[in-house]
Design a protein with these regions (language model features):
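Bacterial Sec-dependent N-terminal signal peptides
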Residues: 18-42, 75, 105-131, 254-261
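Surface-exposed binding patches on compact interaction domains or structured appendages
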Residues: 28, 33, 55-84
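A short beta-strand micro-motif common to beta-rich folds, especially ectodomain repeats
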Residues: 94-106
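Disordered, acidic Ser/Thr/Pro-rich linker "stalks" and the adjacent N-terminal cap
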Residues: 117-173, 183-189, 256-262
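Trp- and acidic/polar-enriched beta-sheet ligand-binding modules for extracellular glycan
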Residues: 163, 187-257
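Beta/coil-rich, acidic/histidine-enriched accessory regions frequently appended to metallopeptidases
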Residues: 259-261, 266, 273-305, 667-807, ...
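Beta-strand-enriched, solvent-exposed domains that form extended recognition/catalytic surfaces
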Residues: 265-437, 773-837
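Catalytic cores of extracellular degradative/oxidative enzymes
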Residues: 450-661, 671
Length: 838
């Protein structure tokens, strides 16, 4: 009985406790927090399958609230602070809707779901009207196709054999022309041109504008700020592809304004990025397409997320013509993809692009996809393409169909000094492409913002724009290597480019006149390379170059990228035999500026060996040796302060008077003469040591191409006569060395005991009497530390030079016969002192 009584007491107690606990818990739930913000109660999604996260501010567990809906194309999940909604792709042609009820003991909410169908913007009904000329005349055609072929709608092109060329069109003067579309041919594509117009009120031609179609294979468009009733229009084509002028079709068009007027009844401007004041739902419902209603409601109800809007609505600035500046500066072409949009697309996507005032400038969207290549590797791999399909944009509504997947870049090339080179506002609205974002150091500024944008990126590649360089690297690799900080990386490489640019003397040009960027990509194969439009660092190498501390941890981590960027900049000082070495002037300069590692390149003893064998410059045989010639010049003129602007001035001289690249023997001597001219110095001895004055005839010399490499005695004599016109002679800087054994980064080089640059800097004199001992072919020098080198000559100090060395103990090569020779210690100023045998 006692046990039964006790059991009953325990059971009753448990029931009472459960009732009390349940009551307390219910009270806790009822007084808890469960909130969904008003702005999140309407969910707009595109037609593609997607997942969205609705923020929930809740103190409840996920079991305390319920989600209910009746649509099979929706699924959901619950997290502590969010409702996860997934939507299947909309297969229909129109918007579909749903209601989702979210119920809790604290509050209830109903979410309105709008999943849009395909783009329903129709602009064909308002198709612009083509104004046909009444007649025309042009420069004599190359065949039977006359200028009439440019407006007859046929594929027959009009072509002239020469430029300049003139195309002149006549009109009734009663129809307004708002813009002109030029369709090129397969050759003769227009470059620079002038456009003249006349009207009934002003019957004489007046210059309407100067344009550059850049000889593109795509159509180009000229937009008039205000339409004109032209009586005649004249094109003066100043340059064309292959020195010809060709036109497949010239369309003169009048814009219809119905759609524009409807949009401007609701939106503040044609970019549709802002509503007019006091716009109500009735006005929005009058818009001609569901597409524009979506934009309007998103703006009105604050449902256009700031992240989306930042990239979908932008003002794009003008960038200089990278092709023109490459020619002027003797460099490889920088990128023209300076304006990322942060929008990615898939092949077949329909896009609406809303363009504001273009200020009479031509602009394009370019879609950058991937390309498959194998380069020199044994396997194919992917990398971003240098170029993609371009779409000409006009002010107002543009409807485009993407021909490939990729990211979009706005191409806005102009004379950046022109008052018309103003920023252009463009809106790529909701439902057109997908926001992936990009990071811009000028706009976004902080590492925190970078980390946020990178974490939201949706595309395979993420774009980072700095002052002078752009990265277009794999998103996953950036998230792995630099997930939180990018400013140290971008600043590091901006500095390297800045240093290279200052060495080539364009600090007054870039970025004030030429503001294009260098673009770096991350191929999935190869290693590192440079070409027009981009430089490449393989995806597998990004960990080496994106963290400055990692870059500085190994000499080659700096050298490789600086070498590739040097390829972009070497043009003015390059000729066949130097392609893989003249760029290393920049690499060594970058090492010097960073301050940790010594310079790179073979020792002077290797030059001595080549000299002793009477080898010419082109036959020196070591790429690591060639680079020392330029570096000796830099040390003498820059480091020693003899002419701190020497290389900038040399680059300017060689841009004004370029080397004859296809005649490398001549180019070699042109370079030597240019050095003399800029330095105002007789550099004969310097270039004599480097083999410039040895005859050579190589009929099939290879250096990224085949060349005839000829240097004959007549060419040599002519160069020497020119050099002799300069009264000041160069000191023996061909013996200058800026490294000592044991320097950080010296590697396996044995650089000698004398000739260090400070001896030239201090103009050290030989105060003692250098002596030597010979034991077979081994020579030991005593009291010679004040010399910069030691020479082996026949006869006196002006006798034939057989060999030289910069060690105090050295084994002479077997080609140097010790009988009948003399040894001389060379002083920093060039004085030779005969050494006595002990």
């Amino acid at each position: 009985m006692i046990n039964i009584k006790n059991i009953l007491i325990v059971c009753i107690s448990l029931v009472m406790y459960s009732i009390v606990f349940s009551s307390c818990k219910s009270d806790d739930i009822a007084s808890g927090i469960f909130e969904i913000a008003t702005k999140d109660l309407v969910v707009d999604v595109d037609k593609e399958s997607t997942t969205v996260y609705i923020p929930v501010n809740s103190s409840l567990t996920i079991n305390d609230w319920e989600v209910d809906y009746d649509k099979s194309w929706i699924t959901h999940g619950k997290k502590r602070n969010s409702l996860v909604l997934s939507f299947e792709a909309n297969p229909g042609k129109t918007k579909r809707t749903a209601a989702i009820k979210v119920t809790s003991p604290v509050a209830e909410y109903t979410l309105a779901i709008n999943q849009y169908g395909p783009n329903d913007v129709v602009i064909t009904d308002d198709k612009d009207v083509r104004v046909k000329p009444t007649s025309g005349i042009g420069t004599n055609p190359s065949g039977s196709n006359t200028i009439e072929c440019t407006w007859d709608g046929s594929p027959r092109p009009y072509m002239t054999y020469t430029v300049p060329a003139t195309l002149e069109y006549f009109f009734s003067g009663t129809e307004v022309i708002d813009y002109i579309i030029y369709a090129p041919t397969s050759t003769g594509n227009f470059g620079k041109l002038k456009l003249y117009t006349a009207t009934a009120e002003n019957p004489e031609y007046t210059l309407k504008g100067e344009y550059n179609f850049e000889m593109k294979s795509e159509s180009s468009t000229i937009h008039f700020t205000t339409g004109i009733k032209a009586t005649k229009i004249k094109f003066e084509v100043q340059e064309g592809k292959n020195n010809m002028a060709g036109c497949s079709e010239m369309e003169f068009c009048t814009k219809t304004i119905t759609l524009t007027q409807q949009l401007l009844n609701v939106f503040a401007d044609i970019t549709c990025s802002e509503l007019k004041p006091d716009i109500n739902d009735d006005a929005i419902e009058e818009l001609p397409a569901e597409y524009f209603k979506r934009i309007a409601y998103a703006l009105k109800n604050n449902r256009y997320s700031e992240w989306e809007k930042e990239f979908r609505v932008q003002e794009y600035k003008a960038y200089s013509n990278n092709e023109e500046w490459a020619t002027k500066l003797k460099i490889k072409k920088y990128t023209d993809l300076d304006n990322p949009t942060g929008i990615s697309v898939e092949k077949g996507d329909e896009l609406i692009v809303l363009v504001g005032d273009t200020h009479n400038q031509s602009i394009y969207l370019e879609c950058i996809d991937e390309e498959t290549t194998s380069s020199n590797d044994d396997h194919e791999y992917q990398r971003p393409a240098a170029h993609g399909h371009t779409f000409s944009l006009k002010p107002g509504v543009n409807k485009l169909v993407m021909t490939s997947s990729g990211q979009l870049f706005l191409i806005y090339t102009a004379d950046i000094f022109s008052p018309d080179a103003q920023p252009i506002k463009i809106h790529i609205p909701l439902g057109s492409g997908k926001v992936t974002g990009y990071f811009d150091t000028e706009k976004h500024k902080t590492n925190e913002k970078y980390a946020e944008l990178l974490s939201k990126a949706t595309h395979k590649y993420f774009c980072i724009r700095g002052e002078r360089i752009m990265f277009y690297f794999h998103t996953d690799k950036l998230q792995e290597v630099v997930p939180h900080k990018i400013l140290p990386s971008i600043d590091f490489w901006n500095n390297i480019i800045k240093w290279e640019q200052e060495l080539m003397g364009i600090e007054d040009i870039q970025p004030s006149q030429m503001n294009n960027h260098l673009m770096a990509i991350s191929p999935e194969g190869s290693y590192m390379w440079a070409n027009d439009y981009r430089i490449a660092f393989a995806k597998s190498t990004l960990y080496k170059i994106l963290i400055p501390e990692k870059v500085m941890s190994a000499k080659d981590n700096v050298w490789g990228p600086a070498h590739e960027i040097g390829h972009v900049h070497q043009g003015a000082i390059n000729w066949p035999s130097c392609t893989e070495t003249s760029n290393n002037l920049f690499s060594n300069y970058v090492l010097y500026k960073l301050g940790k590692y010594c310079s790179r390149g073979l020792e002077i003893s290797k030059l001595a060996d080549a000299y002793g064998l009477k080898r010419s410059w082109v036959e020196l045989g070591y790429s690591e040796l060639y680079m020392r010639m330029q570096w000796q010049l830099w040390n003498y003129f820059h480091r020693l302060g003899n002419m701190p602007n020497f290389f900038p001035e040399l680059f300017k001289e060689l841009r004004a008077n370029p080397l004859t690249f296809n005649n490398p023997g001549l180019a070699q001597l042109q370079y030597a003469k240019a050095v003399c001219k800029v330095a105002n110095m007789d550099m004969t001895e310097f270039f004599e040591r480097w083999g410039f004055f040895r005859e050579v005839m190589l009929m099939n010399y290879e250096d990224y191409g085949k060349y005839m490499y000829i240097v004959n005695q007549g060419m040599i004599d002519q160069a020497k006569v020119y050099m002799a016109t300069f009264s000041k002679k160069v000191p023996p800087i061909y013996y200058l060395e800026d490294r000592k054994n044991g320097d950080v980064g010296i590697e396996d080089y044995k650089v000698g005991d004398v000739g260090y640059y400070t001896q030239f800097q201090d103009n050290v004199k030989i105060t003692g009497t250098p002596t030597y001992k010979l034991s077979g072919s081994k020579i030991t020098v005593n009291n010679g530390t004040q010399a910069v080198a030691f020479e082996v000559r026949k006869g006196n100090e002006n006798g034939e030079l057989l060999y030289f060395f910069n060690f105090l103990s050295y084994t002479l090569p077997q080609t140097v016969l010790v009988d009948g020779i003399k040894f001389y210690a060379v002083q920093a100023d060039g004085k030779r002192i005969e050494m006595k045998e002990e």
